Swiss-Prot record:
Residues 227-248 are annotated as: Leucine-zipper. Forms homodimers or heterodimers. May interact (via leucine-zipper domain) with MAFB. May interact with FOS and JUN. Interacts with PCAF; this interaction impairs MAFA ubiquitination. InterPro entries: bZIP, bZIP_Maf, bZIP_sf, Maf_TF_N, TF_DNA-bd_sf, Transcription_factor_Maf_fam. Keywords: DNA-binding, Nucleus, Phosphoprotein, Transcription, Transcription regulation. Transcription factor involved in transcription regulation during lens development, including that of crystallin and filensin/BFSP1 genes. Binds to CRE-type MARE 5'-TGCTGACGTCAGCA-3' and TRE-type MARE 5'-TGCTGACTCAGCA-3' DNA sequences. Residues 51-87, 126-167, 265-286 are annotated as: Disordered. Belongs to the bZIP family. Maf subfamily. The lineage of its organism: Eukaryota, Metazoa, Chordata, Craniata, Vertebrata. Coiled coil: none annotated. This is Transcription factor MafA. It comes from Gallus gallus (Chicken). The modification Phosphoserine is found at residues 14, 49, 61, 65, 272.
Length: 286
């Protein structure tokens, strides 16, 4: 009974705190019994801590609650500048120990009962961790003086280098590389790195060799077609000449045969005309 009176005497007198505490019906929850060692761990503050709120138990993930009980007899008061004096009432910030879970424990906003708020509070650490992971994905990109990890530097440099290569390779078409003179190409490549210039010139040399090989192949094919056409024309002319030779040979043989027949029979002699009678002068005067 004396302990209940002592606890009642040390309860906060602020109306806001009393109203905040009275919203919860905590009497229906069972009190977890813990060993004395766990109780000592609960009442011990970490080194350098400025808060008078004890730590939570090792077996529980529920955030630590404000301490309304009297200090242990063997405990020593904290020597920190902000520590509360021995036997003093809890500070006002201890009454708002659940301020980090306002989105869980706001019955007016979520239309929840106090029991639902306590259940949400019990599952709050895991939920907070889940939200922390989800918020990590929406972290803004670093600017200016913020440091980037080496992997991010390498990724950004590789992306910029690859984009630079694409711009250089897409700057000239194949026809421009082949038709452009060496002087003009060197003038266009000023300001680029040596590796990019060497790669582009190798590409230009490959294109020129490929074009030269295609030109030679085209010329060979064209020359072969010309020679094949001339061959066909000459073959047709030879056939025509052969036919003409055979015709002339036949005609020669025909004339030769006629000549031989005529020579074998002999040519007939034509009859001489009759001689005119001689007239004398005596016949003339007769």
């Amino acid at each position: 009974m004396a302990s209940e009176l002592a606890m009642t005497a040390e309860l906060p007198t602020s109306p806001l705190a009393i109203e905040y505490v009275n919203d919860f019906d905590l009497m229906k929850f069972e009190v977890k019994k813990e060993p004395a060692e766990a109780e000592r761990l609960c009442h011990r503050l970490p080194a350098g801590s400025l808060s008078s709120t004890p730590l939570s138990t090792p077996c529980s993930s529920v955030p630590s609650s404000p301490s309304f009980c009297a200090p242990s007899p063997g405990g020593q008061p904290s020597a920190g500048p902000t520590a509360a004096p021995l036997g003093s009432k809890p500070q006002l910030e201890e009454l708002y120990w659940m301020s980090g879970y306002q989105h869980h424990l706001n019955p007016e906003a979520l239309n929840l009962t106090p029991e639902d708020a306590v259940e949400a509070l019990i599952g709050a650490p895991h939920h907070h961790h889940h939200h922390h992971q989800s918020y990590e994905s929406f972290r803004p990109q670093p600017f200016g003086g913020e440091e980037l990890p080496p992997a991010a530097h390498h990724h950004n440099a590789h992306h910029h280098h690859h984009h630079h290569h694409l711009r250089l390779e897409e700057r000239f078409s194949d026809d421009q590389l082949v038709s452009m003179s060496v002087r003009e190409l060197n003038r266009q490549l000023r300001g680029f790195s040596k590796e990019e210039v060497i790669r582009l010139k190798q590409n230009r040399r490959t294109l020129k060799n490929r074009g030269y090989a295609q030109s030679c192949r085209y010329k060979r094919v064209q020359q072969r077609h010309i020679l094949e056409n001339e061959k066909c024309q000459l073959q047709s002319q030879v056939e025509q000449l052969k036919q003409e030779v055979s015709r002339l040979a036949k005609e020669r043989d025909l004339y030769k045969e006629k000549y031989e027949k005529l020579a074998a029979r002999g040519f007939p002699r034509e009859p001489s005309p009759p001689a005119a009678p001689k007239t004398t002068a005596a016949d003339f005067f007769m």
